[in-house]
Amino acid sequence: MGILGLSKLIADLAPQAIRESEIKNFFGRKVAIDASMCLYQFLIAVRSEGAQLATVNGDPTSHLMGMFYRTIRLLDNGIKPVYVFDGKPPDLKSGELAKRAERREEAEKALKAATEAGDEAEIEKFNRRLVRVTKEHAREAKELLKLMGVPYVDAPCEAEAQCAALVKAGKVYATATEDMDALTFGSSKLLRYLTYSEARKMPVKEFTYEKLLQGLELNQREFIDLCILLGCDYCESIKGIGPKRAIELINSYRDIETILDNLDTSKYTVPENWNYKVARELFIEPEVADASAIDLKWTEPDEEGLVKFLCGERQFSEERVRGGAKKLLKSKKAQTQVRLDSFFQTLPSSPNAVAAAKRKAEEAKKSANNKKAKIGGGGGAGRGRRPK
């Protein structure tokens, strides 16, 4: 699910935190990619005549087709991807998973009704809703990546949290996912639409964590509380509080505890036994592997291994697979080129660095306001940060 309404809230209140770019602008960058999100996209999008691609035995291959060609496209553009796979979900996510199971059951009933009615559009719609990534899909994707010479990481828990840890450690430039909670986990950069097909012509949307904190006038902890109010995977949200009201409350009271002390409970219903404190801790200290100990290596592809794995039973075109393997080899050799900024040291990001950048921005803002006052500048008061 990610964080409900966060993307629009940032666009409205901190537009300076978002930049749209062409994929080629990320040449030379290492990027941690949410593998489960990608596989889900491929299972839905890579289809023939409305159905998933499959072997003669009916086993799906859409996820492998998508992973193979989209990864080649990234490498063609000089991007070095590392795929991060989900581990076990945290216990606090069980409520969200139960809701997903209910929605799946409803979709199955709707699909049955659409099939009986012969409504092809509805059949396709509900078939897509029933798509889910299995352990077998993930296992096959890992085998494919190994043959392609592309590294992957098995996260102990949430993939987005592990991606954020790799970014913080300076191992990669950004997290690539469609789930906004990568920012809640503290990833300094988030890339959306990076793995979309070229045909969709979607520019890559880059979010910068420090700039969104400055634009929203929040620190890391306050931003996490905002995300919990908006709605996350780990606990329910307060009914009746949408994005606009959530940011107003955080700006006024700075944390959920103080909000609850001042909330009009005749208007808003707080969930019973609300686990917001545990959710907050999951975002602050998620279960991740030590990123500094992870060694990321991009190696040469195994062309014969790829042909054996993808052709035959999986029915990929041998000519196209060999062509893809040659592109992989070519991009591996081309990666000797480097970005100019790679000559400078990349330091791991930290909450202290974010706070320092924020203080610097606030000091610059105060200085500018003082200068305006001296020369008589001014129309009304600007939007200031309320005291904690």
Swiss-Prot record:
Main location: nucleus
InterPro entries: 5-3_exonuclease_C_sf, Flap_endonuc, HhH2, PIN-like_dom_sf, XPG-I_dom, XPG/Rad2, XPG_CS, XPG_DNA_repair_N
Post-translational modification: Phosphorylated. Phosphorylation upon DNA damage induces relocalization to the nuclear plasma.
Region (I-domain): 122-253
CDD domains: PIN_FEN1
Molecular function (Gene Ontology), one example: 5'-3' exonuclease activity
Annotated residues for binding of Mg(2+) 1: D34, D86, E158, E160
Protein name: Flap endonuclease 1
Organism the protein comes from: Drosophila willistoni
Gene name of the record: Fen1
